[in-house]
């Protein structure tokens, strides 16, 4: 199985980010997965504490983690989100240019232990199907009507 790299963008939500990364680390296939974290620079002082906590946490995780490789991009200025050359856009552009597939997530997701396996199998299964443009690991609790 091909293990797609994972991209995570973050800024200052330390507790959310830590849960996200640690749940990803517990996934089947994590040891074969490259992870790219893009830590944006705080736009103002009110974001500095959470940003510093994430930065310190990542310094420790870079040295000791359960991934094939943990790559951290520390932005030197605030890139923002949802605008040209924003933190999200820059990381996605890098992954798109260097890999034929990738997994992108927010920093507040907590993953099931089979998440990576599920997504990677889906990416392989539908690789050549032009009708499929993405594999999703979330299902909104929609009130399905079960019939006979």
Question: What is each of the regions a protein language model found here?
Answer:
Residues 99-110:
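Short beta-strand-to-loop acidic/aromatic patch adjacent to the donor-nucleotide binding site
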Residues 114-148:
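Conserved donor NDP-sugar-binding/catalytic core segment of glycosyltransferases
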Residues 27-73:
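Acidic donor-binding segment of Leloir-type glycosyltransferases
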Residues 89-101:
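Active-site nucleotide-sugar/metal-binding loop of Leloir-type enzymes
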Residues 3-8, 24, 34-37:
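Hydrophobic targeting segments
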Residues 20, 91, 118-122:
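Alpha-helical scaffold elements adjacent to nucleotide-binding pockets in ATP/GTP-utilizing enzyme cores
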Residues 13-26:
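Short, well-formed alpha-helical segments that are part of the catalytic scaffolds
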Residues 77-87:
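A short, glycine-/small-residue-rich helix N-cap motif at loop->alpha-helix starts
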